[in-house]
């Protein structure tokens, strides 16, 4: 017997202006409560989605995000609460923008590939330059073309960085250390990556031959979908101290943002794990509310295999972003006829938006070792946290929030409040408001391209039909999302960037 919309509302209450609680009973077997962060505009979207679902108008086979947050709260071993960030939207198993942490010392606790997502370690890297908007404006089209020529883009795109099967094995194990050894990265790049660009538990043997076959040609390529490289300029500085620590000291300074993940390799690792886990769930009698939430006990062979394979795919994504950084440095050096070093093309930071990792957190006054699943959400550690680079000890970890194509992006910093409320996690971007298919039906790609041109944005796109899926209209407003996190205190705004050129798959 399904409940109507008004029945559902009894399980929801507003904690404060930016946060709602989902009470136990909203879905069966909830071990903990759920919460989600919104402002007025985002709240309306969330409740509309729930109302439509109650009328039977489901979204392309996914449950509404609120239900998904509830179903995650019913997974074995979850602690504290299931958390939806302001950019939350329905996804496979977990909503995108839903994070949850599981107690490593609880033998029942699980790991769920749906809590990481198919694009393992999809993430963002931001590079700074010592160039000014006035330096780039006259050569903007050339620069966009040079980047488009240097970086292979699109669904089936193949990499230009020579790589054989042995190189791939090493890259999967070593992450950025491989790029460093091969001369595609600078030593200091590593300091400014989450996990220092290398997950140590990675085991290339846990990545199937099929996944490797998909990954080999794609290294150093920009995927399709929401992946892009953007030349941006600093539009606003909210926190001068933090910005200076990042090497940003004035409006108009030019930066480059690279948004990409583990391509076909990560997708295959996730698919392989889901198949193995369906069997393990029968064996271990694990019951979940939604079969997309396939999972395995953390300590089981399937759970361990997935974590080792996921770490290897994570390393692949860091190598991928390093390779694209190398190619970006080449493109800039060529256009400005100088060296990347002279252009100060340093990595400000590199964050992951889809990953699960073991972290120490204080829950109910006790320090616990947790497996933190972040899907469509970003680690945002506070000042003085031992896992962030020396340069950022006083500011808190930089958090990179990519807007959608042609809208603004943000750099935030982590807070102590985020540590207690959301396991040191904040939003990751804009979050979809329209499904991909709906975007293709409703929007015309020429309009989207013209609009970007009107805004003075140079654009290079490998597959124009994908442009509508990524049009700003398809997404929630990134400023709403970032302001909600800022007002809720789980991260603070530092810098706002706007695009002047977009290179896209």
UniProtKB/Swiss-Prot annotation:
UniProt keyword annotations, A-Z: Cytoplasm, GTP-binding, Isopeptide bond, Ligase, Manganese, Metal-binding, Nucleotide-binding, Nucleus, Phosphoprotein, tRNA processing, Ubl conjugation
Primary localization: nucleus
Cross-link (Glycyl lysine isopeptide (Lys-Gly) (interchain with G-Cter in SUMO2)): 496
Active-site feature positions: 428 (gmp-histidine intermediate)
PANTHER family membership: RNA-SPLICING LIGASE RTCB HOMOLOG (PTHR11118:SF1)
Record-stated family: Belongs to the RtcB family.
Quaternary context: Catalytic component of the tRNA-splicing ligase complex.
Name of the molecule in the record: RNA-splicing ligase RtcB homolog
Species this protein is from: Mus musculus (Mouse)
Source lineage: Eukaryota, Metazoa, Chordata, Craniata, Vertebrata
Gene this chain is encoded by: Rtcb
């Amino acid at each position: 017997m399904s409940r109507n919309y008004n029945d559902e509302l009894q399980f929801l209450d507003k904690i404060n202006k930016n946060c709602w609680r989902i009470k136990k009973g909203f879905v069966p077997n909830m071990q903990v409560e759920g919460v989600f962060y919104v402002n007025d505009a985002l709240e309306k979207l969330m409740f509309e989605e729930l109302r439509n679902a109650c009328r039977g108008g489901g979204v392309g086979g996914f449950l509404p995000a609120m239900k998904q947050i509830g179903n995650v709260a019913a997974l074995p071993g979850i602690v504290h609460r299931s958390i939806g960030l302001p950019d939350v939207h329905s996804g496979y198993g977990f909503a995108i923008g839903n994070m949850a942490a599981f107690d490593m010392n609880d033998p029942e606790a699980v790991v769920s590939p749906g809590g990481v997502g198919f694009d393992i370690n999809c993430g963002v890297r931001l590079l700074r330059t010592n160039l000014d908007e006035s330096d780039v404006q006259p050569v903007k089209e050339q620069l966009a073309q040079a980047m488009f020529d240097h970086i292979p883009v699109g669904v089936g795109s193949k990499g230009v960085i020579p790589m054989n099967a042995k190189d791939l094995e090493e890259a999967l194990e070593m992450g950025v250390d491989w790029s460093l050894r091969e001369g595609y990265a600078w030593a200091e790049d590593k300091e400014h990556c989450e996990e220092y660009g290398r997950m140590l538990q990675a085991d290339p043997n846990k990545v199937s031959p099929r996944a490797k076959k998909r990954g080999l040609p794609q290294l150093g390529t920009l995927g399709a979908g929401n992946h892009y490289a953007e030349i941006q300029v600093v539009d606003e500085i909210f926190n001068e101290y933090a910005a200076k620590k990042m090497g940003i000291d004035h409006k108009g300074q030019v930066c480059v943002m690279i948004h990409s993940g583990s391509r076909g390799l990560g997708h295959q690792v996730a698919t392989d794990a889901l198949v193995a886990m369906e069997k393990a769930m029968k064996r271990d009698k694990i019951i979940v509310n939604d079969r997309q939430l396939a999972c395995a006990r953390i300590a089981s062979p399937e759970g361990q295999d997935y974590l080792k394979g996921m770490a290897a795919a994570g390393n692949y994504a860091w190598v991928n972003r390093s390779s694209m950084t190398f190619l970006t440095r080449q493109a800039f050096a060529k256009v400005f006829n100088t060296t990347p070093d002279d252009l100060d093309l340093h990595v400000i930071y590199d964050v992951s938006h889809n990953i699960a990792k073991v972290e120490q957190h204080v829950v109910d006054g006790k320090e616990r070792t947790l497996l933190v699943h972040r899907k469509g959400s970003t680690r945002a550690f506070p000042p003085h946290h031992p896992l962030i680079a020396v340069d950022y000890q006083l500011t808190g970890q930089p958090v990179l929030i990519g807007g959608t194509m042609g809208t603004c992006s943000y750099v935030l910093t982590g807070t102590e409040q985020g540590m207690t409320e959301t396991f040191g996690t904040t939003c990751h971007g804009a979050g979809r408001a329209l499904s991909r298919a709906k975007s293709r039906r409703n929007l015309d790609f020429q309009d989207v391209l013209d609009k970007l041109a009107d805004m003075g944005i140079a654009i290079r796109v490998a597959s124009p039909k994908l442009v509508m899926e990524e049009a700003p209209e398809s997404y929630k407003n990134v400023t709403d999302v970032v302001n909600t996190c800022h007002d809720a205190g789980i991260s603070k705004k530092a810098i706002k960037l706007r695009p002047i050129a977009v290179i896209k798959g």
